[in-house]
Amino acid sequence: MTNRRGKRVNWWQSKAYVGLLLVLMIMPLLWPPFPPLDDVPTHMGRFYIQTGMAGAPTLSSIFSIDWMPVGNLGVDALVYALHPLMGVEPATKLVIILIPLLSAAGLLLIAREAHGELPATAAFALPLIYNYAFHYGFINFSLGAALAFLLFGLVLRYQRLKMPTVWRTLILLGSLLIYFAHIFGWVVFGLLVVGNALYRHVTSWKISLAMVRAVVLECLLLALPLIPIVAWRSGDNQGETSAFFAIFDKWGWIESAMRDRWVKWEGLSALLCVGLIGLGIVGLMRMSRRLLLVFLVMAAFYIFIPYAFFGLIYADMRIAPLMLAIGILAIAPRPAWGRTAASAIALLALAFVTARSVATTISYARYADDHARWLKVLPSIPRGARVVALVAPPCPRGWNVPRIIHLPSMAIIRRDAFVNDQFDMPGAQLVAVGPSIPRDFAYHSSAQVRLPGCDRPEPLLADRIAQIPRGAFDHLWLLGVDPANRPKADWLRPVWSDERSALYAIVRQKTSSAAKAGPRG
């Protein structure tokens, strides 16, 4: 078999090899009942609110939905479309499985189009799909980035085929699609398109007006999302921008690009990715000039972007692994090395993907088992209850932190209960908590506490319990609180407990008849 250049197709360029890589990419997500990513329970709670409040009077009396052109709707929209067929939890799992699948397909397509064939090194980039942002549960962003990679690969393909109407339409309409998935996915797509435009039109160090004009016109195809952005980011929806030039954090985000559970394994994996890019930069490996320019554009953006960008936190952390992935796609073995050396490199790349996938599968299975133990309390929560959850994560917090801070949202999905775990992000979420729940206990920011002896900024558990508005809630759920630190107040009646968590019914004091009658005499 030969490729489009008439060259023999090597085994690492075959459909079977690509299919194997795609299977390895989805393997970690197949076993857990729901993806064990940090923020996913809160996202699923939001999806449930957006789709199922008609049969949940407690939720419908507390939550409201404000439909607006938010650049944060990718997984929301897909789950909304799929939930009538399978329910919110299976729909969420299916959509999240699609994210690494689309990402891998996009990255491999980019590499193939940039090099004219799939290089033996391309698979080294795939483990970066399971990056820190993905483990954190930034699923709308991850979907936006996956679409950005896939559409950019198609743009390169149709530019090669000299079909300008098709690739321009892909950029124009693809920008809008990616924006609605997540605004920062659109930013990623923009970086890819800008780098590619520089490659196509800047042909010498002597920059002419014609070059500038061609680059600008190509980049203007990205501008369609500015229309909903103006509507969305007007008024009070501006969002915070802060922490410019936190240079010392930049290397940390690169080092933790694949942060999940094992600090040495994930740190060394990230360093391997950096080392591979370094081999290309110093000239030991061949580099695609096109993808090198895209990588440099992303690197410049990464250096200058702040931590918080128009209300989007961890902005620079999200870019780091994607930048590394493009850098790896830019490299390829030199033709002079021969097929044997290239085959050995492809085997090493496959081994790396397999090892990363197996490790992530084990990690996710452990998180899923841990979640099942934490959620044994759910049957004891009355359907339609109003629950205030207080979570005390381990102190100090290291590389591997139990993913429990958003587990209370599972009571929204499985018990139709209100829990104070939705995000308070004006202008970035459709769901808001109504006035029947005091704002100090309405959102996720109210849920985290610390135990005595823990030197962290969260409030002490005892202080937070004393502040609970008893009239607004009927249950208290403590997670990560050992028996020695649990409250013994008269107004808290134990309902369920184990060594790590406890559920209490909040006993409301009844007003005595004498008090109702008022003072005499």
Predicted features by range, described:
Residues 32-43, 54-56, 63, 71-72, ...:
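Transmembrane catalytic cores of multi-pass membrane glycosyltransferases
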Residues 45-52, 63-88:
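Short hydrophobic/aromatic helix or loop-helix immediately within or flanking a transmembrane segment
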Residues 94-114:
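Transmembrane-helix motifs of polytopic, lipid-linked glycan transferases
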Residues 107-129:
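Transmembrane-helix signature of polytopic, membrane-embedded enzymes
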Residues 136-143:
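Short acidic/glycine- and proline-prone juxtamembrane loop motifs at membrane-interface regions
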Residues 310-338:
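Hydrophobic/aromatic-rich transmembrane helices and adjacent perimembrane loops
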Residues 329, 333-358:
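Signature aromatic-anchored transmembrane alpha helix within multi-pass, membrane-resident enzymes
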Residues 367, 377-459, 468-481:
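Short periplasmic/luminal acceptor-recognition loop of GT-C membrane glycosyltransferases, typified by
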